[in-house]
Amino acid sequence: MKTQVEHAVDGIITEQMATVAHDEDLSPEYIRTMVAEGKIVIPNNSNSTPKPVGIGKGLRTKVNASIGTSSDIVNYQAEVRKARIAEQAGADTLMELSVGGNLDRVRREVLAAVNLPVGNVPLYQAFCDATRKYGSADKLDPEELFDLIEQQCEDGLAFMAIHCGINRYTIERLRKQHYRYGGLVSKGGTSMVSWMEHNNRENPLYEQFDRVVAILKKYDVCLSLGNGLRAGAIHDSHDRAQMQELIINCELAQLGREMGCQMLVEGPGHMPLDEVEANILIQKRMSNEAPYYMLGPISTDVVPGFDHISSAIGAAQSARYGADLICYITPAEHLALPNEDDVRSGVEAARVATYIGDMNKYPDKGRQRDKAMSKARRDLQWDKQFELALMPEQARQVRDSRLPEEEHSCTMCGNFCAANGSKTLFDGDLQGDKC
């Protein structure tokens, strides 16, 4: 069976491409061309029917939500509820990142619960299984890792974050720079580095990259090149280890595309705002515009409990400069496993961020909704305001909880409503458009 990339190269517009074109108000031929060039991906699986979601050049910036058990908290029903909440709140994709309990069970229950494209990190289960079976993650048998990747593809996952870019050379760059304020912050990345050091061997996901691609290509699953050496502190942003891994991932993205597999490149998690534009420019240049999946980024390290806000600020910048998929951050980041309220808050914050970013990335079409909202506010058209709101239910709920005496106003200003005063003063003189 051919992949989306192979169909696109052959000039065929698939059902998935046509759906994305309709949803994005773009031509099917544009989507086909970008998929063929590796600049748009549509996470998919030949064993399942996830909702077609386009990620990449010229498209709305998408939001990913991550859920999953931990070794301390295992509640399968709660993770299914979180997955459904993420979908209801407007997430475009979902990652199931469990490391506690029966990992096959939670993955399959989440896949059955939502219509979104679902991804994961195969290394999590591989190292968990090795620990249970052999007493140490460092005793992982690479053959069991490849078997697991295939099993998870068979279950219906649409994309996988796989840490192929960590190799002996990148680890040496980290060691020789003699600092890392935030240390290593990727669970999969840290475990793979430990395995490599303990066994004095190369990363099998890098060494046998063609084998990884062959498995995912068999199911038309999108390969997201994970960043196990990403910066976990803003003072580590763009250090040599992170950049070396990015270089390798961009090289692998090109190789994977040439083999007929859909490829994403993952970006960093902590980054000061003044470095965001440069980071995206570097990734786009080195990867020939492969879709970029940014993990936030968190733009300051000192607001635990409010990292969803810090991340939203960074995500707006990322979307504006060309990031294609943003992984949400919740208020629980750095503190605890997110609960259901945290998941909703994280999705909402990321949606606001990507909307703001897209307003500036696509100014011609991205600001028309805001113009319509401004007119509705000026004219005190409340139903129209709710219709245009990004999250209308929340807006309506707030207003209904504090209704004013006069229907046209709100309880913020009451009888001193500036919009109503403006309407009275100018009586239609402000109804025109800019020249």
UniProtKB/Swiss-Prot annotation:
Q: Which organism is it from?
A: Desulfuromonas acetoxidans (strain DSM 684 / 11070)
Sites binding Zn(2+) sit at: H270, H334
Which key words are in the record? 4Fe-4S, Cobalamin biosynthesis, Iron, Iron-sulfur, Lyase, Metal-binding, S-adenosyl-L-methionine, Zinc
Q: Which EC class is this protein assigned? A: lyase
Q: Which residues bind [4Fe-4S] cluster?
A: C410, C413, C417
Look up keyword Transmembrane and say if it applies.
no
Q: How does it assemble?
A: Homodimer.
Which Pfam families does the record match to this protein?
Answer: ThiC_Rad_SAM
Binding residues for substrate, per the UniProt record?
M95, Y124, H163, S186, K187, G188, N227, G228, L229, R230, E266, Y293
- Gene Ontology molecular function: any one: lyase activity
This entry's comment on the bound cofactor is: Binds 1 [4Fe-4S] cluster per subunit. The cluster is coordinated with 3 cysteines and an exchangeable S-adenosyl-L-methionine.
Q: In which pathway does it act?
A: Cofactor biosynthesis; adenosylcobalamin biosynthesis
Protein name from the UniProt record: 5-hydroxybenzimidazole synthase
Name the job this protein performs: Catalyzes the complex conversion of aminoimidazole ribotide (AIR) to 5-hydroxybenzimidazole (5-HBI) in a radical S-adenosyl-L-methionine (SAM)-dependent reaction. Is thus involved in the anaerobic biosynthesis of dimethylbenzimidazole (DMB), the lower axial ligand of vitamin B12 (cobalamin).
